[in-house]
Amino acid sequence: MMKKDAESLLRETKAILEGHFLLTSGLHSPLYVEKFNVLQHPEYTEKLCEMIADHFRNQGVQTVIGPATGGIILSQVTARLLGTRSIFTERENGKMTLRRGFRVEPGEKVLIVEDIVTTGGAL
């Protein structure tokens, strides 16, 4: 695949939708990114994660965390490219939490790879 920027990659996979969208935050938006339009194509997912990994490659990231469900794929591929471990959060009682024995140690450098961010409240 030729070198692409993130926006052109998202447009090529028809992940950027235009119209009027009421987001789960209650906000309205003229654009929506349908992440699963990208995630169904492994080669595009890989390229997007390469962009993320390249940006953080020299930051000493030790663990990549993504939210279930869509963020798991992004965090897993990004972690593989960075040579680090990947863990994920799950919603429990309305909050995203580490479960399944996953832990982050004090001082551990973590990269959070979110699948969708509107207000940042779920982080």
Predicted regions, residues:
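PRPP-associated nucleotide enzymes
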Residues: 1-123
